[in-house]
């Protein structure tokens, strides 16, 4: 066993923990199909959102961790439930009144309200694939409609007929009495209307491969369960799919957790082996409600990428997947700065166990680029943008190159992108919310002390010395808690409740420029 493999096995990073579960489930043998199948799912009722990105990003992290532990080939499929009947018209699509005419129709049988694809389902599938391709995910796309119609599930659908009573015995206790009288695992596709029907099944014939039901006119209708003439209810469908495709690893949101036992039992009833499963918590919007594709009540990936790199959003996805997290734009600077810190720690660390525990290893699948920001952070650049009040990144670069002559837009591309992100974020979220504190007599004394300190240092003074001097002024200013001292300074100088280490900020902004800023605040006791 190689040293790297030993270190990977010892790692407590959650992707490696999941990968070891998969390896343990194999009992030392590769599957008969010759590869490990990872599956993610997509409900194409609405556009791909940040949760879609999260599931696929996390899945690939586990897939790549498994590839560190084993030489068994792997494959990732993204399965679209595009044969589901439309239950609700999304609020964020064009021509909702047209779409409303096709309630209960399979998503791939509804005209595309965007006017670009064969159907609504095809449009959403295309958006999904474009979304996944944009971020470099390597996957195979599976359409539920295609799988059913092409006969890929036919063998398992016949087996569902053969095990009909056993499956009903499993499912019925989970329903209320009223639903028990109407439930059936099969949903016929109406030959007349094309709708996905939720009707009681009157008869079923495993040998003939058919089910019978009464239509809305009371007529007996017999249809084959194969060839796309029927679809399974979503709970049996989940378990059937695991058995048919021989899925080895599946991720799903907490909304599936209560039904995971049913999925697994149905898979076993059909002769399959349930996959290793991982349940992640759901993202919440600003009101603490579950984000939804159809409601469009979340930050989109494109929204995030307007203000930060993809690595920062991947870091957010990596952290604590089993914990519910709210999505706010305020999270972006924090995640960018955390990524910068973790990237630097990774390249300073030689111990592979520690490296494997670093999120950036999993974000970059082991090929971690080395970035250099020369001690500058997103938060610091936001503050620099605030005092400069500029939308011109060359203004920021004037301060950056003075602070660190080695840094240039051409040689420090990550830092250059960071300046662009900071300007956008400042313009959209900070500028209109700045609120400056009225300068009191106590504040005037503090500001004069800071001016005196600045007059006795130069741009060559180390930032730690500047920070200590600012701290010492605070110590003698009568604050019981220095937190409020710094908060007052941030509100006076930057119009914000929070801010950077002032030693670093002054070093970046420049001693003379900082003196001018302080003098300006002394002259203008309040700024609207």
From Swiss-Prot:
A motif ('HIGH' region) lies at residues 44-52. Its EC number is 6.1.1.6. Belongs to the class-I aminoacyl-tRNA synthetase family. Its main location: cytoplasm. The keyword Aminoacyl-tRNA synthetase applies. The keyword Aminoacyl-tRNA synthetase applies. This is Lysine--tRNA ligase.
């Amino acid at each position: 066993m190689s040293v790297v493999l030993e270190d990977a096995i010892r790692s407590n990073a959650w992707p490696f923990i999941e990968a070891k579960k998969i390896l343990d489930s194999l009992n030392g043998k590769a599957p008969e199909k010759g590869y490990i199948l990872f599956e993610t799912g997509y409900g194409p009722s609405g556009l791909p959102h940040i949760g879609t990105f999260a599931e696929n990003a996390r899945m690939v992290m586990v897939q790549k961790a498994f590839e560190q532990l084993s030489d068994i080939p792997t494959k990732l499929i993204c399965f679209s439930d595009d044969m589901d009947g439309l239950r609700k018209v999304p609020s964020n699509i064009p021509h909702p009144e047209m779409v409303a005419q096709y309630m209960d129709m399979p998503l791939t049988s509804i005209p595309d309200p965007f006017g670009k694809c064969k159907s609504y389902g095809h449009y959403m599938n295309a958006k999904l694939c474009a979304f996944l391709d944009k971020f470099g995910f390597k996957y195979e796309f599976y359409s539920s409609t295609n799988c059913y119609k092409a006969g890929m599930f036919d063998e398992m659908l016949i087996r569902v007929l053969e095990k009909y009573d056993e499956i009903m015995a499993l499912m019925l206790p989970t329903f209320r009495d009223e639903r028990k009288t109407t439930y059936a695992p099969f949903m016929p596709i109406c030959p007349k209307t094309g709708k996905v029907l939720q009707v009681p099944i009157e008869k079923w014939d495993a040998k003939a491969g058919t089910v019978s039901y009464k239509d809305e006119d009371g007529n007996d209708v017999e249809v084959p369960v194969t060839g796309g003439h029927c679809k399974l209810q979503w709970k049996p469908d989940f378990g059937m799919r695991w058995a048919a495709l021989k899925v080895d690893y599946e991720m799903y949101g907490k909304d599936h957790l209560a039904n995971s036992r049913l999925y697994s039992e149905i898979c076993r009833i059909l002769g399959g082996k349930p996959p290793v499963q991982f349940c992640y918590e759901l993202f919440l919007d600003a009101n603490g409600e579950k984000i939804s594709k159809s409601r469009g009540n979340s930050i989109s990936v494109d929204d995030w990428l307007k203000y930060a790199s993809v690595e920062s959003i991947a870091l957010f996805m990596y952290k604590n997947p089993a914990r519910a997290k709210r999505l706010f734009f305020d999270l972006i600077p924090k995640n960018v700065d955390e990524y910068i810190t973790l990237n630097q720690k990774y390249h300073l660390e030689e111990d592979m166990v520690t490296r494997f525990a670093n999120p950036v290893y999993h974000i970059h699948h082991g090929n971690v680029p080395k970035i250099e920001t020369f001690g500058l952070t997103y938060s610091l650049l936001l503050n620099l943008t605030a005092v400069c009040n500029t939308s011109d990144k060359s203004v920021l670069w004037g301060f950056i190159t003075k602070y660190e002559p080695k840094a240039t837009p051409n040689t420090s591309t990550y830092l250059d992108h960071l300046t662009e992100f900071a300007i956008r974020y400042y313009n959209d979220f900070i500028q209109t919310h700045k609120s400056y504190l009225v300068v009191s007599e106590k504040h005037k004394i503090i500001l004069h002390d800071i001016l005196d300190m600045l007059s006795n240092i130069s741009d060559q003074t180390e930032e730690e010395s500047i920070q200590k001097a600012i701290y010492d002024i605070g110590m003698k200013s009568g604050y019981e808690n220095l937190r409020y001292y710094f908060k007052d300074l941030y509100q006076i100088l930057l119009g914000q409740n929070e801010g950077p280490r002032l030693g670093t900020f002054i070093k970046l902004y420049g001693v003379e420029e900082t003196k001018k800023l302080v003098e300006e605040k002394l002259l203008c006791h309040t700024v609207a």
